[in-house]
Structure formats: structure tokens, C-alpha cells
Amino acid sequence: MAAPKGKLWVQAQLGLPPLLLLTMALAGGSGTAAAEAFDSVLGDTASCHRACQLTYPLHTYPKEEELYACQRGCRLFSICQFVDDGLDLNRTKLECESACTEAYSQPDEQYACHLGCQDQLPFAELRQEQLMSLMPRMHLLFPLTLVRSFWSDMMDSAQSFITSSWTFYLQADDGKIVIFQSKPEIQYAPQLEQEPTNLRESSLSKMSYLQMRNSQAHRNYLEEEESDGFLRCLSLNSGWILTTTLVLSVMVLLWICCAAVATAVEQYVPPEKLSIYGDLEFMNEQKLSRYPAPSLVIVRSQTEEHEEAGPLPTKVNLAHSEI
């Protein structure tokens, strides 16, 4: 038949390895035994094959060529999807239909092969969705948990360097100062031991006395525990208090430095310029010339041509005059 030959040519056009081509050719002639080895790689086509068997039953279609063409269409779709890495299933369907057109010359076989490509499409979409759901995804709260774990590790490492200790300074008779340093010891109050009493042998007065003593001791224990609770909490959580104080101090110092460096625009005072530059700017604003052009004024008077000058004043001898 011409169908296996056409199928080999289509698979060669898809660029598959020679071993895979040989296996597919054997699968076309000897059944589905050899093709089952590639189901994990090419995808399962059993559902598509069952759809082809329901579409082309042997009691209705006595010829097996159309059934085989439909099943080969399912296989061609899987091969095209494997070659294209399953990026676009619509493109894979078009390639499968073109391969069916080139592989089969009879219109009935071509239609059956196209039907196999169409039947394999929903199963391929379902398998792709299942693969996408199996991919690991980052949760939205993962950055917060990562920051929290990093902060807790940093606080634990910082707390390990901080040690609390008690220091006592004593002055001896000879004037020397003796220093005692030790770690604080945690003392737990002893638990109250209940005395075993026999209800048959003990009297009512003894029971009331024991209950009164136990209640009074329990009350004294609670009062001591409340008075020492705050100091004990400070001694146990001194590392956290010091760490928090250190972090807050660093943040306050950074804020003070940033506030001192950054000055607001409206609070910025420009430096005072020299007076000569101020006068120059004033002249430029008033559009005055720096050196005005000198002006020469000439005054002319009209005199008569024949006018003579008057007589000179008489000379007076100052020695003969009386003042």
C-alpha cells in the first residue's frame, strides 16, 4: 500500500531520527506493540485510538484502511507536538492535517486522518494542563517567610554574642577592690509537696488546717512570683532588649543624618553677593549703559559788529586813600 510509504516521507520531513522513523514504520505494519515504547515520550494516544474505533467500527466499515488512517492521525499529532515542543497546539493540528494530506491520496483516508488529528487535540490540551499544574510555583507569602527566617537567624546570631552577667565590686580592708563576675543563675521555686493524708484516720480539724496552710503558702508563692516576674523577664530577655535598642538607635542616627543633609528649597538662603555685582545687576535690569556718551555744549551769542568796549576803570592809589 502507498500509505506506509507516504508516512515515512512525512516523518522524514518532520526531522525525526532514523531509529524513530524505523520504529514508526514497523509500528505501521505490525501493530501498536513497537509504538508503545514511545508513549512516554510522544504522549498516550490510547484514548484517541478508542475514539477512532467508535467512529469507524468494523461491523459498519468493513475496510480497515480508514480506521488505521484515523489512528495514524493520532500518532502524527503526537509526533508533530513532540517536534514543536507543544508550544502551539493549533499549529500542531495544522501540521498534522498537512502531513495527512501528503501521506494519503484517497479522500476517505485523508478525512479519517484529519479526524484523528482533531480527536487527539483535546487529550493533548488536557495533558498539557496537567503538566503545567505539576510545575512548582512560588507562593505569594514566600518572600515574607524568607525575610522572617533571615531576620530570626540574624537575631539568634546577634543574641549569641550578647551575654548577661552579674558583676560585684567589693573593697577590702587594705583598700583593694575585688571584682566578682558570674552569670545569673535561675532559681526555681520548689513545688509544694502535698502530704498524703488518709481520710479515714485524719480528723476534720487536721484537714482544715492543711487546707488553710496550703492556701496560704500558695498565696505567698503567687505574690513572690508576681513581684519577681518582671525582673526575671528582663534577665531572660536582655538580649532582645539590647538588640531592639541598638537597631532603633541606628535608625534614629540615620534619620538625623538624612535630615541634616537634605535642606528644603524654601529654607535655602543664597549667599550675599558683592555690591559691585549688585550694582551691575541693577544696571542690567534698568537697561542703563555703563559708560554714557559725553556731550559737548556750545553756546553762541550774537554781538554787534561796530560795538566797542567800554572804558577801563580808573586806577586808585591805595597809599593816598583813607579806609
Curated annotation (Swiss-Prot):
Coiled coil: none annotated. Residues 260-323 are cytoplasmic. GO terms for cellular component: Golgi cis cisterna; Golgi medial cisterna; Golgi membrane; Golgi trans cisterna; late endosome; late endosome membrane; lysosomal membrane; lysosome. It is a single-pass type I membrane protein. Residues 1-35 form the signal peptide. The modification Phosphothreonine is found at T303. GO terms for biological process: autophagy; negative regulation of protein localization to plasma membrane; positive regulation of autophagy; protein glycosylation. It is found in: Late endosome membrane; Lysosome membrane; Cell membrane; Golgi apparatus membrane. Keywords: Autophagy, Cell membrane, Endosome, Glycoprotein, Golgi apparatus, Lysosome, Membrane, Phosphoprotein, Signal, Transmembrane, Transmembrane helix. The keyword Membrane applies. One of its GO terms (molecular function) is endopeptidase activity. It holds the Pfam family BSMAP. N-glycosylated. The chain crosses the membrane at residues 239-259. Residues 36-238 are extracellular. It comes from the Eukaryota. InterPro entries: Uncharacterised_TMEM59 (IPR022065). The keyword Phosphoprotein applies. Belongs to the TMEM59 family. Acts as a regulator of autophagy in response to S.aureus infection by promoting activation of LC3 (MAP1LC3A, MAP1LC3B or MAP1LC3C). Acts by interacting with ATG16L1, leading to promote a functional complex between LC3 and ATG16L1 and promoting LC3 lipidation and subsequent activation of autophagy. Modulates the O-glycosylation and complex N-glycosylation steps occurring during the Golgi maturation of several proteins such as APP, BACE1, SEAP or PRNP. Inhibits APP transport to the cell surface and further shedding. PANTHER family: TRANSMEMBRANE PROTEIN 59, TRANSMEMBRANE PROTEIN 59-LIKE PROTEIN. The ATG16L1-binding motif mediates interaction with ATG16L1 and promotes autophagy. This is Transmembrane protein 59.
